[in-house]
Amino acid sequence: MFDLRYHVASLAAVFLALAVGILLGVAISGKVGDAEDSFRAAEVERLSDRLQEEQERAVAARQRGEAADELVERTYPVLMEDRLAERRFALVFLGPVSGRARSAVERTLSDAGSGDPVRMVALDVPVDVEELDEALLADEELAAYAEEGDDFSGLGDDLGEELVAGGETPLWSALSSLLVEERAGTSTLEVDGAIVVESWSAPPTEDVDEAERIRATRSLLDGLLRGLDNTGFPVVGVETATSDDSAIDDYHRLGISSVDNVDTIAGRLALALLLAGGQPGNYGVKDSASDGVVPPIESVPPPETGA
């Protein structure tokens, strides 16, 4: 039988072990806490340094941007002067007229010596598939365009080519009441290029009939863009810097050059350079501008003088 002294000694040993454990735990937790505090302090310092670097880069970028804007603004009149002189252009809205885009395009052409667009057409979209089919089938010369059901890409191709060529335009004459919302200018003169503004965007829908109408409209618009491009003249799709719905992906998909900030000085310069035959690409300030702000700038050839 254990005596009292042994029992007391055992209890003392247990309490001593507990005390040592508590002291060690406190020491270790203190060290861990110190380590965590040190880590947090180092992380805060690292993030602070990184933020400072980003802020410095942002300031530098803003300063470069302001300098570039100032340079473009100062050189704009010289770079634009007569760049499009004696050239004629068509302005095409794939949807209703956008006043802001129209004003920017007209300003571009005026600044570059071209004057107002020779003709402007705004399409009435989405198309009414049944009415368009009926109109096509009622004319022997147009009936073939209705053979593909709701695919009007072939019709769009020929409409685009007619729009550039001018002169007699049998397709536009026959279908204007169905396809044209607004027009201005003359249709008789050939143009040297076209500016396109896609001002209509298809709304999301689960309605089968409406989805068919949207597909038919898209096929017509894509065909028209291809038809314009097939002429070999410059075709440029444009939008303003603040456009809610961007059409740049559509232009890019069809191989059409684009400017996404036509309502700015740099955008107007980019448009003029492209219409003058500059390097094709997607220009502007948005993420879609894969080729920079403006195309490479070439000098305007001096006017020819007699001997």
Predicted regions and their residues:
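Terminal targeting segments of Actinobacterial cell-envelope proteins
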Residues: 1-6
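Hydrophobic membrane-insertion alpha-helices, especially the h-region
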Residues: 9-25
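Long, leucine- and charge-enriched amphipathic alpha-helices
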Residues: 30-79
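Signal peptide-directed extracytoplasmic domains
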Residues: 59-88, 94-155
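Loop/turn elements at helix/coil->beta-strand transitions in domains of secreted/extracellular proteins
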Residues: 115-116, 190-194, 231-234
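A substrate-binding/cap region within the structured catalytic cores of diverse enzymes
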Residues: 124-216, 220-223
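Extracytoplasmic/luminal low-complexity segments enriched in Pro/Gly and acidic/polar residues
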Residues: 196, 200-307
